[in-house]
Amino acid sequence: MDSRNMLVVYSVNLEKKLNAAAHHTIEYQTQKLVLRRGQIFSLKVMLNRPLQSHDELKLIFNTGHNMPFYTVELDPMTSYRSKGWQVKIAKQSGVEVVLNVISAADAVVGRYTMNVNEFDAGVFFLLFNPWCSDDSVFMASEEDRAEYVLNDTGYMYMGFAKQIKEKPWTFGQFEKYILNCCFRLLTHLEPKEMQSPVLVSRAICTMMCAANNFGVLVGNWTGDYSNGTAPYVWASSVPILQQHYITRMPVRFGQCWVFSGVLTTALRAVGIPARSVTNFESAHDTEKNLRVDIYLDESGKTIPHLTKDSVWNFHMWTDAWMKRQDLPQGHDGWQVLDSTPQEISEGQFRIGPSPVSAIRQGLVQIMYDTTFVFTEVNGDKYIWLVKQNQEREKNVLIAVETASIGKNISTKMVGENRRQDITLHYKFPEGSPEERKAMEKASGKRPDDKLNSRTLHISVLQNSVELGHPINLTIVLKRKTATPQNVNISCSLDLQTYTGNKKTNLGVIQKTVQIQGQESEVSLSMDSSFYIYKLGMVDDEMVIKGFIIAEIVDSGERVATDTTLCFLYSAFSVEMPSTSKVNQPLTITCNFKNTLPIPLTNIKFSVESLGLNNMKSWEQETVPPGKTINFQIECTPVKTGPRKFIVKFISRQVKEVHAEKVVLITK
């Protein structure tokens, strides 16, 4: 062919705005085009002459060093095949040709370079596609996709089962550097692995933890965060992933809700539907026997060298939505992924993906790590009394609780700023034949019922303490008889973190009462002075854990239970306008009163929003008892649209107090 007649590509327009809108990727803050696999995108190609029937246009899509590339030529067929990459002419006008390209629904995800007849057409990112029915992350409901893929804000649910608190969280999966960071975390995967949401999600989960190959977050539960950021300070995944991307170093520090928030962000960023999930009264079984063993002395104090298991007030992980083509049928849908460094799986700290369907049925052999998650949501709690007998210890089982683990499993409701209870997705109703059958299937043995003959039953009514006020407990004792009986009650109260880590014992309350009738209430009280001066001993939010033992004097029968009390603190008041303009100052006015009898130290108020470039803060060293402070924080919105502003208050003694408001930012 005469070189003067050779077909030459002069330019390629990736039609970023048009394609991004069609692929639901217009919010990504990147100069590169972001596409979803299995869906048509358009290219506008300028040639040196009109395209003729004998001409060839060859497109090469390359995913990087040592990675395969796809070569696609013009297809004369007008219809698209069911599989593979394809390219067709959509429109031709003189030297301008519009091409429609469709990637394979199981294509490698990641960063691509593209060449058209050796012309460098640029770079784009290819994501998983929940809108594509042939993609293994397909999600049928548009409302679900809007929530689990596109929503960049949400809530974490914290506290404990009887006193659930919501914590606003900014996922920010579209923000600058986030997508780059997520794909850089996956550079160690083989091409075939980058096709699978199962393997990609497991790899992302692994790389969230700094203990695994310099991953994103350093876990810290010591209460000393002096060389980093305290976990409770974070309210967004964005600064964490941005810092990791820029520095290539692990970010200090995280706890379970931070790990969950960042993992949810990363999964949504690469196109895998995801949600942060909270399990209240979450078991941590160190012996893999599907139960938690707690050992008490005769006053109700825990015995640390024997009590290796723990029950967390709450624990958070992330659910990801996908087909499980690597498993038998019936395990598609939500999968548990947990990047909090608790357990080793195949040599690294990670959990999952574990099918929620398998967890519910007790199918603990199903991959990955289903035994651990099953115990978290459906384990049993054994309480042992350790008795000293002639210098020897004797362990006596005094309580078996089959319904106290895995309460109020929660996530944000689709399309609403409310909590959704999804407990029955993870387990059958407590006490039902199906629930006990799942436990039997998981453990391989029938449940222990040797304590069912007990005549005395114990429970506790309270679930909170107003900070600065006495601890008041009401113990409820139930019997089948109305005969008067003397009962010894011993209640040990600890100050501990949400993971069950005991920081100090506040004291033991002991009382002997005569109970009459089939139900009796016994009041116990401890003055606030026993705890108020210990709140700042560690830089963590603290709760009160109580272990109560009741003994019938005549028969010696003992029963036990435990309770968790959270501290309540009155919120501060915040004023901000309902509307504001981009690039103009917005003023937030705060009013706060210290209602405690002790000074509050290391005061910090902060404002975060996806409408701001940076977090804004106001700090003060000390607020004396009874003192009221008023101040203003000024910030400048840089993005239009409805933007949620989160104002947080923290101090050494009081944590996790916040207010929020949506402000409409206009041009």
Curated annotation (Swiss-Prot):
Stretches for region Disordered:
430-449
Q: Where is the active site?
A: C256, H315, D338
Q: What is the lineage of its organism?
A: Eukaryota, Metazoa, Chordata, Craniata, Vertebrata
Q: Which reaction does it catalyse?
A: L-glutaminyl-[protein] + L-lysyl-[protein] = [protein]-L-lysyl-N(6)-5-L-glutamyl-[protein] + NH4(+)
Q: Cofactor comment in the record?
A: Binds 1 Ca(2+) ion per subunit.
Gene that this sequence comes from: Tgm4
User: What biological-process GO terms show up in the record?
Assistant: mating plug formation
Q: List the cofactors.
A: Ca(2+)
Under which main EC class is this enzyme filed?
transferase
Supply the EC number(s).
Answer: 2.3.2.13
Residues annotated as signal peptide: none
Protein name, entry field: Protein-glutamine gamma-glutamyltransferase 4
Q: What PANTHER family does UniProt report for this protein, alphabetically?
A: PROTEIN-GLUTAMINE GAMMA-GLUTAMYLTRANSFERASE, PROTEIN-GLUTAMINE GAMMA-GLUTAMYLTRANSFERASE 4
Q: What induces it?
A: Androgen dependent, as shown by the decrease in the level of the protein following castration.
Q: Report the GO terms under cellular component.
A: collagen-containing extracellular matrix; cytoplasm; extracellular region; Golgi apparatus; plasma membrane; side of membrane
In the record, the note on similarity to other proteins reads: Belongs to the transglutaminase superfamily. Transglutaminase family.
Recorded hits in Pfam families, A to Z, give: Transglut_C (PF00927), Transglut_core (PF01841), Transglut_N (PF00868)
Q: Which UniProt keywords apply?
A: Acyltransferase, Calcium, Cell membrane, Copulatory plug, Glycoprotein, GPI-anchor, Lipoprotein, Membrane, Metal-binding, Secreted, Transferase
